[in-house]
């Protein structure tokens, strides 16, 4: 039997009594964002809306985006990345578990020097995929052209954010490349490994 989203007490400044809010709303008030699912239009719009609200509320307090995502749709992922670049506060990105495909793209979009992976996190990059398999020939050609444009956009962002040559990123994206936290740091996708002792 599902219990739903847990509720936690929260007291507004100046209030005597605490009210109950769902745990995500409480965390959002602390500027903690979570991407714990596939990237789609709905979660992208939620994250962008929260970032814009927090940006307007206080431009001086950083935001923290925790990522455990198998990836998802390309355009919603790019829109989350763009929103992270647009807001004034720094956005720290923290990979817990898996940041694959669009998840790793969003992870890379955190403020440089503030991109973190937990010690046992995994990161995966690859090229975007098409959804047209049984369309008209003209539709398939147009879709392929659009995918190539998106691939170029993603490749350029990875190259800029990791400081790797464009050709290296392009070659690596030809297949699924899985990385440990240390490998992701060496690659330039993250800057730090949390809880690291050495």
Swiss-Prot record:
GO molecular function: ATP-dependent peptidase activity; ATPase binding; serine-type endopeptidase activity
Nucleotide-binding found in the keyword field: no
Keywords annotated in UniProt: Chloroplast, Hydrolase, Plastid, Protease, Serine protease
Any single Gene Ontology cellular-component annotation: endopeptidase Clp complex
Catalytic-site annotation from UniProt: 101 (nucleophile), 126
EC number: 3.4.21.92
Protein's UniProt keywords contain Cell membrane: no
Principal EC category: hydrolase
Superkingdom, natural source: Eukaryota
Cellular location(s): Plastid, Chloroplast stroma
HAMAP family: ClpP
Protein name, entry field: ATP-dependent Clp protease proteolytic subunit
Gene: clpP
